[in-house]
Amino acid sequence: MQQTAWAPRTSGIAGCGAGGVVMAIASVTLVTDTPGRVLTGVAALGLILFASATWRARPRLAITPDGLAIRGWFRTQLLRHSNIKIIRIDEFRRYGRLVRLLEIETVSGGLLILSRWDLGTDPVEVLDALTAAGYAGRGQR
């Protein structure tokens, strides 16, 4: 059976949250100067908020009977077949490493970019599933 929902890995989100908690504890107990305490406290709060918002936005991309559901931190966007112009993979080298992004371009001119972090897997696998579901490729409705 084909996978129909993609989300960031639970371990990655938990790692960010745990790192934020450890940093917050270190900020209160280990850092003695006020500016350092404020900076590490703000960084800890940022990590905790990032982990919370990322957890809330799961699954990031899902194939539903109504269309493609793309969840963000604050809302879910539903894209029907008629709203999607093209779905493609963008590949480029960054720091000697090949990076792939899944790009979903809408008819209204919007561009949604999803990385491996967002999808929890290789974007090429997601594109294959979207092609099999009729959202991309020659069989596009």
Curated annotation (Swiss-Prot):
Location in or out of the cell: Cell membrane
Source organism, top-level taxon: Bacteria
Pfam families, alphabetized: bPH_6 (PF10756)
Keywords (A to Z) from UniProt: Cell membrane, Membrane, Transmembrane, Transmembrane helix
Membrane topology category: Multi-pass membrane protein
Transmembrane segment boundaries: 12-32, 35-55
InterPro entries assigned: CFP-6_PH (IPR019692)
Cellular component terms per the entry's GO annotation: plasma membrane
Protein name: Uncharacterized protein MT0013
Organism for this UniProt entry: Mycobacterium tuberculosis (strain CDC 1551 / Oshkosh)
